[in-house]
Amino acid sequence: MKSCSIILILSVLFLCGCSSYPVPPEMVAKYAENIVVDGIHNEKGWSETPEYQLTTARSRMKELHPDLREKYGRNPASPGTVRLLFDRQYLYVGAVLTDDDIISLGTRDQQVHCGEGDVFEIFLKPENANYYWELHITPAGYCAVIFYPSRGYHFLSKIVMPEVRPLKKIKYKSVISGTLNRSGDFDRLWSLEAAIPLDELAAKGIPFDSDHPWRILIGRYNYSCHQKICELSSFPQLNRFNFHAHEEYGTIRLVRAKSKIRP
C-alpha cells in the first residue's frame, strides 16, 4: 500500500513537471472616463492601470541559432509595454513600443499588415465561444479588423481579410518618435491607443462585462534594418509564437475605480 502511494505521488509530480504551459496571467483593465484617443496616454487613468511587458516566446532560446540567443532569446531587443482601460462604451488599449527603425509599407486599412512592416496586434475572444477578433494597428495609422467565427476557419480566404471592417466604431491613433520608412537613421519609438466598441463585440452574442469572461493576447511584429531578425513579442508570454493559441491567452479582469488590484 505504501509503495502504491509513493508511485502515485511520483506520477503526479512527473505530470506537473512535464507541463510547459503555465496558467495564463490576467490583464487588469481599470475603469476610466474622458479618454481621448490620441496615442499619447496623458490621461490620469493610464498611469493608474497596470503596465505589462511584451516578451519573447519560451521556445526562442532553443529555436534560435546560438549566435542570436543572447540578444533575442530572453527578452525583446526592442521592448514594448501595454495597458488596458475601459468605460461604458469602449475597451482601451494603449502601447509604447521601442523601435530603432519604424517601417510601415501598408497603404490602406483592411490589409494584412504583418507582412508590410511593424504592426501591433490585439486578439480578443470570449471564454465560452469559438469566435474571436484580430486587430492590426500600424505606425502609419492604418487599422485592420478580422472576425473569425472559429479558429477552424483561420485560413479561409473570405475570412482572412474582409473588405469592410467588422468593427465600424473602432477608434485608433498612432504617434511616432522618429522618421517613417527611412532606414538610414535611428528612430526612438512609436505609441498607440485603440478604443474597441463594446456593443459591437457584444453583438456577436456574448457581452463584454464582468459576468462574461473574455481572453486577450497582445502581439507585435517589429521589423528593423538594424536588427538581425524580425522580432516577435507578446503578452502573455507564449510557449511558441502562435498568436492564435487561444489556450495561452490571458484573462481580462475589469476593475472599477474603488476596487483593489491583486498583486
Predicted regions and their residues:
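Positively charged n-region of N-terminal signal peptides that target proteins for export
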Residues: 1-5
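Bacterial N-terminal signal peptides
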Residues: 7-16
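Structural preference for beta-rich elements and adjacent junctions enriched in aromatics
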Residues: 18-263
